[in-house]
């Protein structure tokens, strides 16, 4: 029977308990290695070495001892790893900073230890979205699982394959935003995991009355990161924690298998944005995962509204790209987060043909969703259009290709670069896995305006919906090729060629509702009237308590669709909610391998010459120098005076001549031999204290910035409010309608019944999403729309709500006579999407006009570009210099500094005190005397030689015989002088 009117709104249920935290997403690629820490101070010079002793002349002095090496400069203090904040949404890739000048390499800091992975939390209701994290170097996006609560980010594991999307939970009320913490250190981005095959779309349950929005679930506390556990189901995304400073990147863990997606928790209300955290240094980039095979495309969802513009991150210091890490295992999910976002809508089936709207009959069943067509590649984004009213959240499509890295920011000091990791081929972005720790954010680009939605292609008359095929399992993700220009969208079912859309006439006043006649065959479709002016958006109705979800009515036969009424007024776009708190960044990964060595800057000026070492100790005496030449023989001494004759006695014979007198004193000491070769200088005394370091030369040209790390997957901006769908072009002339049965006889018009809730409309044609397509969340139960105002004139078709899995169609009303359409029942509500991401709450939509006949979906428009990267916001303050990276391996010994200029020659050391002359050389042997030449004339007496040393006494000759005892009396001597007078005699 026809579905009854919705019951009153129920009382909101108690806040849902936070769902379990989802597993931590696999780590993104490792960020580039952080810049090296500043060089440690130079150690004090060692004490000067002792000079070597002076050698004796000729003997080289002993080299002085070398002074002990000066102590190594203190190690730079490793920066502390920032507290990991909760992970925020993935930001855009920061612009690579220009390469900074190379700083002197500091000692290697200790590598930060990787934080443990947080334990998986339960999936909670969606928390307040954090402020968009500053983008790290994006890791490749994995397939998106249901968002788990973001745990404390551990080192991100690699993205695992995405599980199938879960069903959306109820949308929770908006929670208060927590303060944004400082950004945590960025973990290395893991390699991209292969996306798992999407699960088949679930069958749509019967549409019930939408429950009221529930109270926001309590926000789960962030737990301490646990050790990496097995992956659990991803929970809803928790509130982002404060962003901590980026720590050094932790090592990349192995990627675990992705868990099955959990059910999506209720979306929490948007919180106020927290302050942006300090950006940490990027972690090393991981290698990209293989591109998975292209999954079957889901239908394109309706574009969400553009997300609000993130704050630009500060430029990170670009580190060299780290080596590609291995795929880490996923860390356990963190503590339960706040309520997760509403789940993504399941894949939509092929839209059923729009029937001609008769008076609403009882709703008929919807056709089953057909298998999804192949995924079109995301096309290039169209130019941004003005933001439209916020539509219901569409199905999230696949994320678009990674944005290119932005312009390089000013580089920080050049660290010890690691070798660049290989850039993996960009994978096709799978669904985003549970987010890894964010890389340091680059400045968030401004959100580009959303391009106007392309005008929908003419919509042909959709064929009747086929029974839904099972969703194909997506193939494995192939290795991503470059994202080419978007390929054509996969073929859709054949559509008739849309005719031109006729001008829609103004809606006539609703006549009284006739009783439903027997359903006629579809009549020819009349021209659409001109679109009515959009009604203003009514104030949102008071949110009632959620009623119980009514059982789905049994689908009645589907009535013909009436002509599309004019479009209802667009709702005003909901405000974007405040940003959630950015989640903690995982602990720093290991320092990336040192990047390429930057060019050495020019050598600084030579330091001043060290102080002159003290004179060395005197060397030991060298061996005696060669004897000086013997002096010339002293002149013969004058013959001694002849002795007085002895007392007469026979004169003893003269003894034999004494041996030759001693050689004259040595001639003057020969000149001291030229000093022997100078002893080799002792090793230089310890260098004096280093002169002040020369100014660091102007930085060498910065190395070219390494190639930008692979662009991260385009961060998913929160999908902004959907661009207003371009006005649907006038509907093409309807394709030939199916044959119109003859209309049933009109029943007498009854008084218009209250419109039964409209059966779930056939699926709307899929509008291409201009944003990146995430996987569609299953639309959360729709909040009740505000009380339905009187239907505005039916506007052109509002943007289609997200295609949920087709609800079971209510039984189609029988087609009434195709008369003036009865007042259109309010369209069955598409579930209003749970607030997606930071979407503000959707204001109550003006009641959608009855949907116009769906044009055939135009080809999927090219995916909107991720909004153009907004201009780079002013750079945020540079994050604190990341902790000094682990000390890189000692770089190759720099070229030996130029030899300092030779110090001035020290004053010649005092000549060592001349050693005492060596003992005189032994006199040369006297050559044999030559035969005496004839005596030359007696030369003038030579100058007296220095008196020789007394010769050795000659051996006394034999004593001559005693002379006679009595000599002759000598002659009488002269009389002596008179003696003194004697003393007087006695009297």
UniProtKB/Swiss-Prot annotation:
InterPro entries: Collagen, Collagen_superfamily. GO terms for molecular function: extracellular matrix structural constituent conferring tensile strength. Pfam families: Collagen. Residues 155-167, 799-809, 845-860, 972-987 have a biased composition (Pro residues). The keyword Repeat applies. Keywords: Calcium, Collagen, Extracellular matrix, Hydroxylation, Phosphoprotein, Repeat, Secreted. The modification Phosphoserine is found at residue 93. One of its GO terms (cellular component) is extracellular matrix. Residues 1-987 are annotated as: Disordered. It is found in: Secreted; Secreted, Extracellular space; Secreted, Extracellular space, Extracellular matrix. Type I collagen is a member of group I collagen (fibrillar forming collagen). This is Collagen alpha-1(I) chain. The gene is COL1A1.
């Amino acid at each position: 029977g026809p579905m009854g009117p919705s019951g009153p709104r129920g009382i909101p249920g108690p806040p849902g308990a936070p769902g379990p935290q989802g597993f931590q997403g696999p780590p993104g690629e490792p960020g580039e290695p952080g810049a090296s820490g500043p060089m440690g101070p130079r150690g004090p010079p060692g004490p000067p070495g002792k000079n070597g002793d002076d050698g004796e002349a000729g003997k080289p002095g002993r080299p002085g001892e070398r002074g002990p090496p000066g102590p190594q400069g203190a190690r730079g203090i490793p920066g502390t790893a920032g507290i990991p904040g909760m992970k925020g949404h993935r930001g855009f890739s920061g612009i690579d900073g220009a390469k900074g000048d190379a700083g002197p390499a500091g000692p290697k800091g200790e590598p930060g230890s990787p934080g443990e992975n947080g334990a998986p939390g339960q999936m909670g209701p969606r928390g307040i979205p954090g402020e968009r994290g500053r983008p790290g170097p994006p890791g490749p996006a994995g397939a998106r699982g249901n968002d788990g609560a973001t745990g404390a980010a551990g080192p991100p594991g690699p993205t695992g394959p995405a599980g199938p999307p879960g069903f959306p939970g109820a949308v929770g009320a908006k929670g208060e935003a927590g303060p944004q913490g400082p950004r945590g250190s960025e973990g290395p981005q893991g390699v991209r995991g292969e996306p798992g095959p999407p699960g088949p779309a679930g069958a749509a349950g019967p549409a019930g009355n939408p429950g009221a929005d529930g109270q926001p679930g309590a926000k789960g506390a962030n737990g301490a990161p646990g050790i990496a556990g097995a992956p659990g189901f991803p929970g809803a995304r928790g509130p982002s924690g404060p962003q901590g400073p980026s720590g050094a990147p932790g090592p990349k863990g192995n990627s675990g298998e992705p868990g099955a997606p959990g059910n999506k928790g209720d979306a929490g209300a948007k919180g106020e944005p927290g302050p942006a955290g300090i950006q940490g240094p990027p972690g090393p980039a991981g290698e990209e995962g293989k591109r998975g095979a292209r999954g079957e495309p889901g239908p394109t969802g309706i574009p969400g509204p553009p997300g609000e513009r993130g704050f630009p991150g500060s430029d990170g210091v670009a580190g060299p790209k780290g080596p590609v890490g291995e795929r880490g295992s996923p860390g356990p999910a963190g503590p339960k987060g706040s309520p997760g976002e509403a789940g993504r809508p399941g894949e939509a089936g092929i839209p059923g043909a729009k029937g001609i709207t008769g008076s609403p009959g009882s709703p008929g069943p919807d056709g089953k969703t057909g298998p999804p067509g192949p995924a079109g590649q995301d096309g290039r984004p169209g130019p941004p259009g003005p933001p439209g009213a916020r539509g219901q959240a569409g199905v999230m499509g696949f994320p678009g290709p990674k944005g290119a890295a932005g312009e390089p920011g000013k580089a920080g000091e050049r660290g010890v670069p690691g070798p660049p990791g290989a850039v993996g081929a960009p994978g096709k972005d799978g669904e985003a896995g549970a987010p890894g720790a964010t890389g340091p954010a680059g400045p968030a680009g401004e959100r580009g305006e959303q391009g106007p939605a392309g005008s929908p292609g003419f919509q042909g008359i959709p064929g009747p919906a086929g029974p839904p095929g099972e969703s194909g399992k997506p193939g494995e993700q192939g290795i991503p090729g470059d994202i080419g220009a978007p390929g054509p969208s996969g073929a859709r079912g054949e559509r008739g060629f849309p005719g031109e859309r006729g001008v829609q006439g103004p809606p006539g006043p609703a006549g009284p509702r006739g009783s439903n006649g027997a359903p006629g065959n579809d009549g020819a479709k009349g021209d659409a009237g001109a679109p009515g002016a959009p009604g203003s958006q009514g104030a949102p109705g008071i949110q009632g308590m959620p009623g119980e979800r009514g059982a789905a009515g049994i689908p009645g036969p589907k009535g013909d669709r009436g002509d599309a009424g004019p479009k209802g007024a667009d709702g005003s776009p909901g405000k974007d909610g405040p940003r959630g708190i950015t989640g903690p960044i995982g602990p720093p990964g290991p320092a990336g391998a040192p990047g390429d060595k930057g060019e050495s800057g020019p050598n600084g000026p030579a330091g001043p010459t060290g102080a002159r070492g003290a004179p060395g100790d005197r060397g030991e005496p060298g061996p005696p120098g060669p004897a000086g030449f013997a002096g010339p023989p002293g002149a013969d001494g004058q013959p001694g005076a002849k002795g007085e004759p002895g007392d007469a006695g026979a004169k003893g014979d003269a003894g034999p001549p004494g041996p030759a007198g001693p050689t004259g004193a040595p001639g003057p000491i020969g000149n001291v031999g030229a000093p022997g070769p100078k002893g080799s200088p002792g090793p230089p005394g310890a260098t004096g204290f280093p002169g002040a370091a020369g100014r660091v030369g102007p930085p060498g040209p910065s190395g070219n910035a390494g190639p930008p790390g692979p662009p991260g997957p385009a961060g998913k901006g929160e999908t902004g409010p959907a661009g207003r769908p371009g006005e649907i072009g006038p509907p093409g002339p309807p394709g030939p309608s199916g044959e119109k049965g003859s209309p049933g006889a009109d029943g007498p018009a009854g008084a218009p019944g209250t419109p039964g809730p409209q059966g779930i409309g056939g699926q709307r044609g899929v509008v291409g999403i201009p944003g990146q397509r995430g996987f569609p969340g299953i639309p959360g139960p729709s909040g009740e729309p505000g009380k339905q105002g009187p239907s505005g004139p039916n506007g052109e078709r509002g943007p289609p709500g997200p295609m949920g899995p087709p609800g079971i169609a209510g039984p189609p009303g029988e087609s009434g006579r195709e008369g003036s359409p009865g007042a259109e029942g309010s369209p069955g509500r598409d579930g209003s999407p749970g607030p997606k991401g930071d979407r503000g709450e959707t204001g109550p939509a003006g009641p959608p006009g009855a949907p116009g006949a769906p044009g055939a979906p135009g080809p999927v428009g090219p995916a909107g570009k991720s909004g153009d990267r907004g201009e780079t916001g002013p750079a945020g303050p540079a994050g604190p210099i990341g902790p000094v990276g682990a000390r890189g391996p000692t770089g190759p010994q720099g070229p030996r500094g130029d030899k300092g200029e030779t110090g001035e020659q020290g004053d010649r050391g005092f000549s060592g005190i001349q050693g005492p002359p060596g003992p005189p050389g032994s006199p040369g042997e006297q050559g044999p005397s030559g035969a005496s030449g004839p005596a030359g004339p007696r030369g003038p007496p030579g100058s007296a030689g220095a008196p020789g040393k007394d010769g050795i006494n000659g051996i006394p000759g034999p004593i001559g015989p005693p002379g006679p005892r009595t000599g002759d009396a000598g002659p009488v001597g002269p009389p002596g002088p008179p003696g003194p007078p004697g003393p007087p005699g006695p009297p």
